[in-house]
A protein has these predicted regions:
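Hydrophobic/aromatic-rich core segments of domains that either
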Residues: 67, 71-138
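N-terminal accessory/pre-domain segments preceding catalytic cores
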Residues: 1-15, 19, 75-76, 143-264
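Short secondary-structure transition/capping segments
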Residues: 46, 93-96, 254
Length: 264
């Protein structure tokens, strides 16, 4: 598996640092939830993830990304702690379900499952790390739920909180089921595809809205025509999808767009 994984992220079979591995992963394997909208179960066993994300060159969301990455790191000799956290993106104080999977290696956060805001390399607990023009940091705090947690920030923006309590693969089956099937889950309501592009550009496609955040802070937004969706997913995001899959996703997003209330 490890040879195929390294080839998938564009690395040779030599020794690589955690920083090299993490950047290669987040720039090679897109964050995405498309299988939810194609009516497929999100499986978290490593064999299924190797088939999907390596052999079929698809992406995945946090449980898929970090489960695959943890397996690769362990195959390379690293000791990995699997953690669980709460997303804080849009409101840092509201209680949130614990639905984000994160990873630790030797006191370093090595998460590859947070989409376009994902750190480009390891971040030390209680410290910060700068990659290109972006700085991530972790700090101890007490969450609204009363937990002693680590807060992860991109600059000053809160991303998520997590604890260092070790979790096992079976612990993610229930939050994965909620995230991929429950009508209140953000992932069942819209398609989300994100990645770090070349040049440290954050690229996100939510429904048919494309957002590009450039290193200098400029933000570009574009409305995507459903007929152009396939070229965008295959080209910009590197996802191998057949014509039927693209058509189904385009129809879903066109329906979502037409059902959305008009802006005045």
């Amino acid at each position: 598996m490890i040879e195929r994984y390294l080839a998938r992220v564009g690395l040779d079979g030599g020794d690589h640092s955690l920083a090299e591995l993490q950047r290669a992963h987040v720039q090679s394997i897109s964050y995405e939830n498309l299988d939810i909208h194609l009516g497929r179960e999100i499986r978290l066993d490593v064999d299924s993830l190797v088939d999907k994300m390596i052999d079929r060159r698809r992406g995945g969301y946090c449980y898929e990304q970090n489960t695959l990455y943890a397996a690769a790191l362990e195959a390379l000799g690293f000791t990995v702690t699997r953690c669980l956290g709460r997303v804080r993106l849009s409101d840092a104080v509201s209680p949130r379900p614990a639905t984000h999977m994160a990873l630790l290696v030797d006191g370093l956060l090595v998460d590859v499952g947070f989409g376009a805001a994902n750190p480009l390399g390891p971040v030390p607990l209680g410290g910060e790390a700068t990659y290109g023009p972006y700085t991530w940091r972790t700090e101890r705090t007490v969450s609204p739920e009363g937990e002693q947690v680590w807060m992860v920030r991109l600059f000053d923006m809160p991303l998520y909180t997590f604890t260092e309590t070790p979790h096992h693969p079976i612990d993610y089956l229930t939050p994965n089921h909620f995230s991929s099937t429950h009508p209140l889950s953000l992932f069942t309501q819209m398609t989300i595809v994100q990645r770090w592009d070349d040049g440290d550009v954050q690229v996100g496609l939510v429904g048919l809205g494309l957002t590009e955040r450039l290193p200098d802070g400029e933000v570009k937004t574009t409305s995507v025509d459903p007929g152009d969706l396939g070229d965008l997913l295959r080209g910009r995001f590197g996802l191998e999808l057949d014509d039927d899959e693209v058509d189904r996703l385009a129809r879903f997003n066109a329906q979502q767009q037409s059902a959305a209330p008009a802006r005045s």
